[in-house]
């Protein structure tokens, strides 16, 4: 992979260079010493992966991540001196589109890089995701639902760590997946379009922005795209609303899940992925109470085990699954649903 380094500390840059050099398949494309320079470099020479520090002069790592996802979306890994001490900034950057976060590597005795440091494992993981990027071709049309019937709806909520989890989930779904998918990811509207474009590159299904008045369609993935709440109306169409005003997250997973319970007339499946806090737990519980199947991501595969943990704690999940098993479960559930309707 071609990797861009964004860090203003020479010692940290050298540690990153030497760690990357342990993998002959990777090379340093450029080094930026602040966020503004990183944005310009990403536009002029798009890398496969950016290693982004958080605290830098001019533009910090969070703002740079936002700008990159707006102007030239690419994979971004937060690499900072102490992830734990900068947790709030890390979560903000992951909400802006960064895939994951890891501590800056240190050099061993004699200035050598340690191959066991977590950075290499993170780079390898992202490299595997990039290797599965789908060609830009029109996906096959999903098999039509029976006349007059709504397609199954898969409602997905995610927050910190969501971009990586969503990429891994979507790439496992076939191009003829006969369900509609709506995603509520905690992102600012400024870079939602970039995230949709990013996800589209790893999905056999088209990923688009959810538009006011649109209707979820089989074989299509829609992403909430404003700082208002996405919800279903009584007519089954999508709309955005400022209410409720007091929610800590915008868009809110809970608001969308509750609207599925109230207004979706067909089958539905709720999925709550990695994320900080509790958003989505009550909505997932409401979906399960209504009779819909619900899934929460497990702790071992969650970047931040907050939202799915809250859901599991209140019995909101029909199943708690590792990320790699969720797509297969969705395929199985949708197939069973179609067989019942024949």
Swiss-Prot record:
PROSITE patterns: CHEB, RESPONSE_REGULATORY. Phosphorylated by CheA. Phosphorylation of the N-terminal regulatory domain activates the methylesterase activity. Keywords: Chemotaxis, Cytoplasm, Hydrolase, Phosphoprotein. It is found in: Cytoplasm. Residues 2-119 form the Response regulatory domain. GO terms for biological process: chemotaxis. The modification 4-aspartylphosphate is found at residue 53. The active site is at residues 159, 186, 279. The keyword Phosphoprotein applies. GO terms for cellular component: cytoplasm. It holds the Pfam family Response_reg. Its EC number is 3.1.1.61, 3.5.1.44. GO terms for molecular function: phosphorelay response regulator activity; protein-glutamate methylesterase activity; protein-glutamine glutaminase activity. It catalyses: [protein]-L-glutamate 5-O-methyl ester + H2O = L-glutamyl-[protein] + methanol + H(+); L-glutaminyl-[protein] + H2O = L-glutamyl-[protein] + NH4(+). The keyword Phosphoprotein applies. Residues 144-337 form the CheB-type methylesterase domain. It is an enzyme of class 3 (hydrolase). CDD domains: CheB_Rec, REC_CheB-like. Involved in chemotaxis. Part of a chemotaxis signal transduction system that modulates chemotaxis in response to various stimuli. Catalyzes the demethylation of specific methylglutamate residues introduced into the chemoreceptors (methyl-accepting chemotaxis proteins or MCP) by CheR. Also mediates the irreversible deamidation of specific glutamine residues to glutamic acid. HAMAP family: CheB_chemtxs (MF_00099). NCBIfam families: PRK12555.1 (NF009206). Belongs to the CheB family. Contains a C-terminal catalytic domain, and an N-terminal region which modulates catalytic activity. This is Protein-glutamate methylesterase/protein-glutamine glutaminase 4. It comes from Burkholderia thailandensis (strain ATCC 700388 / DSM 13276 / CCUG 48851 / CIP 106301 / E264).
């Amino acid at each position: 992979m071609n990797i861009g380094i964004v860090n203003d500390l020479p010692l940290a840059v050298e540690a990153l260079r030497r760690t990357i050099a342990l993998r002959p398949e990777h090379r340093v494309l450029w080094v930026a010493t602040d966020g503004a320079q990183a944005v310009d470099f990403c536009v002029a020479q798009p890398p496969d992966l950016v290693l982004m520090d958080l605290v830098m002069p001019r533009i910090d790592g969070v703002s740079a991540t936002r700008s990159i996802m707006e102007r030239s979306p690419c994979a971004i890994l937060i690499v900072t001196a102490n992830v734990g001490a900068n947790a709030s900034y890390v979560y903000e950057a992951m909400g802006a589109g960064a895939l994951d976060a890891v501590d800056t590597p240190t050099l061993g005795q004699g200035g050598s890089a340690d191959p066991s440091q977590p950075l290499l494992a993170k780079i390898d993981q992202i490299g595997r995701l990039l290797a599965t990027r789908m060609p830009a071709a029109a996906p096959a049309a999903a098999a039509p639902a029976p006349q007059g019937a709504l397609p199954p709806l898969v409602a997905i909520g995610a927050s910190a760590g969501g971009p990586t989890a969503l990429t891994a989930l979507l790439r496992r779904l076939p191009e003829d997946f006969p369900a509609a998918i709506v995603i509520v990811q905690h992102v600012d509207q400024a870079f939602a379009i970039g995230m949709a474009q990013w996800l589209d590159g790893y999905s056999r299904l088209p990923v688009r922005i959810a538009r006011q008045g649109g209707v979820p369609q089989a074989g299509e993935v829609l992403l909430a795209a404003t700082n208002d709440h996405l919800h279903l109306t009584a007519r089954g169409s999508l709309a955005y609303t400022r209410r409720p005003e007091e929610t800590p997250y915008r868009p809110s997973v809970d608001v969308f899940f509750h609207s599925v319970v109230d207004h979706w007339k067909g089958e539905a499946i709720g999925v709550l992925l990695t994320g900080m806090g509790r958003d989505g737990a009550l909505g997932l519980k409401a979906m399960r109470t209504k009779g819909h199947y619900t899934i929460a991501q497990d702790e071992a595969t969650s970047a931040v085990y907050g939202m799915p943990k809250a859901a599991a704690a209140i019995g909101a999940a029909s199943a708690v699954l590792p990320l790699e098993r969720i797509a297969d479960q969705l395929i199985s559930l949708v197939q069973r649903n179609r067989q019942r309707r024949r």
